[in-house]
Amino acid sequence: SGQYSFGL
C-alpha cells in the first residue's frame, strides 16, 4: 500500500 507507478 502507498505505491504509485505510471508509464509515459
Curated annotation (Swiss-Prot):
It comes from the Eukaryota. GO terms for biological process: neuropeptide signaling pathway. It is found in: Secreted. The modification Leucine amide is found at L8. One of its GO terms (cellular component) is extracellular region. Keywords: Amidation, Neuropeptide, Secreted. Belongs to the allatostatin family. May act as a neurotransmitter or neuromodulator. This is Carcinustatin-17.
